[in-house]
């Protein structure tokens, strides 16, 4: 099977998890990843490498869901995944590592770099996908929106734009430069 990182309905995720086989070797890689990911190290980066068809995307998707922990038909992903640990050498240790993920909330961004424009480099591509995952634009407008989010001003901005533009919502205005730029200027003059 080819793993599509964009398929994320509950049924599709459940089916992919049911088909995932956690070998001792994969469990060791999972443990190494969780050790680094849950450490105090800042800006942990991970690079998955392997031959074509070796299961990198599948493993990455399972990691993403373990971190994000979505509910699948009323049961958390981590709870469903825990059945994969039964019988492994380090079952209890890995279970504790997975449980430690609950200490924080994460924003997981899964994307296939082969299907995304990477003409401006991997950092730009990853940032664009991050912005899209937050429901923001994947351009300079998205950077402004993200700045407003970080400063707890985004909701005020949305209300102000709607008020200043005869009830038109920002999500509709931002699609067109002819409407987004004037709306941005008016609102930013008030907010900043």
Give the residues covered by each predicted segment.
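Short, functional N-terminal and low-complexity linear motifs
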Residues: 1-3, 28-30, 89-96
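Short coil/loop residues immediately preceding or within conserved phosphate-binding loops
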Residues: 43
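Extended, charged/polar low-complexity intrinsically disordered regions
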Residues: 1-19
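Conserved P-loop NTPase "ATPase switch" module shared by AAA+ and STAND
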Residues: 192
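N-terminal pre-Walker A segment at the start of P-loop NTPase domains
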Residues: 13-39, 85-88
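P-loop NTPase motor core
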Residues: 17-20, 46-51, 58-188
């Amino acid at each position: 099977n080819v793993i599509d990182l964009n398929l994320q309905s509950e049924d599709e995720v459940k089916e992919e998890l049911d088909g995932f086989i956690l070998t001792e070797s994969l469990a060791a890689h999972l443990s190494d990843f969780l050790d680094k990911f849950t450490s105090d190290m800042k800006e942990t980066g991970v690079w998955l490498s392997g031959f074509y068809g070796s299961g990198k995307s599948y493993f990455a998707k399972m990691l993403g869901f373990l971190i994000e922990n979505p509910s699948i038909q009323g049961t958390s992903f981590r709870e469903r995944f825990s059945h994969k640990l039964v019988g492994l050498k380090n079952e209890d240790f890995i279970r504790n590592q997975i449980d430690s993920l609950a200490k924080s909330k994460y924003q997981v961004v899964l994307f296939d770099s082969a299907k995304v424009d990477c003409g401006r480099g991997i950092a730009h591509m990853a940032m664009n996908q991050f912005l899209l995952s937050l429901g923001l634009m994947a351009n300079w407008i998205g950077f402004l929106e993200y700045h407003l989010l970080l400063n707890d001003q985004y909701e005020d901005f949305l209300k102000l734009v709607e008020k200043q533009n005869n009830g038109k919502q920002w999500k509709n205005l931002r699609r067109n430069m002819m409407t987004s730029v004037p709306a941005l200027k008016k609102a930013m003059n008030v907010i900043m």
